[in-house]
A protein has these predicted regions:
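Generic cytosolic/nucleocytoplasmic N-terminal low-complexity/intrinsically disordered segments
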Residues: 2, 23-25
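Bacterial N-terminal signal peptides
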Residues: 9-20
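Acidic/polar surface patches and capping/hinge elements
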Residues: 26-182
Length: 182
């Protein structure tokens, strides 16, 4: 329960930051430098700004992308445990290089973003190309596989979370699932 509360708190903080940037003609850009988490966070925020979803959908997108990133990163940490697969993706010590972490994080974020914002796939493909990663399925490295596996596990779970993403988040609770007491 405490973990869930922490995740919800982080999502709310990110969402509040998003609300402060929506509608600005030139949003402030984070100086990402070499931090791939910031690079992919900016891709997520840019997608939200360009295709503004409802606030709850925006918060959900941020949570999914960052959970996929965390789960990919956790595979390369000796103690961290992924949210969906636990320690099942843990990589051997020899594989725990910065290059592998970067690649896994990028592939996880990429898959999550393409799933959430399919109309922007060309933008995400270009970002991956800029980072030196192929998105055509030719990269069969373990790091790419870790990223895809981590993201797929998160996406499979979130596709069943009741948000109805597959149908444009349409209300699937007709006539009404909730009847308030009078």
């Amino acid at each position: 329960m405490r973990k869930l509360t922490t995740v919800i708190g982080l999502v709310l903080i990110l969402a509040l930051g998003l609300v402060a940037t929506v509608g600005r003609p030139e949003p402030a850009r984070a100086a990402a430098g070499d931090n791939l988490v910031l690079v992919w966070n900016e891709q997520t925020l840019e997608s939200i700004r360009k295709l503004p979803p409802a606030p709850t959908v925006a918060a959900r997108a941020l949570a999914i992308v960052h959970t996929a990133i965390y789960d990919a990163w956790a595979a390369y940490d000796p103690l961290a445990v992924g949210t969906r697969l636990g320690a099942g993706l843990r990589q051997p010590e020899a594989e725990r290089t910065q290059a592998n972490k970067d690649k896994a994080i990028s592939f996880a974020a990429y898959l999550a973003l393409v799933d959430l914002f399919p109309a922007r796939q060309a933008v995400f493909d270009q970002r991956m190309a800029d980072l030196g990663y192929a998105t055509d399925g030719s990269d069969l490295s373990s790091a790419a596989t870790v990223g895809f596996t981590a993201a797929k596990a998160v996406l499979d779970f979130r596709h069943g979370d009741g948000s109805n993403q597959a149908n444009g988040y349409a209300d699937s609770c007709k006539p009404a699932c909730y009847e308030p007491d009078e």
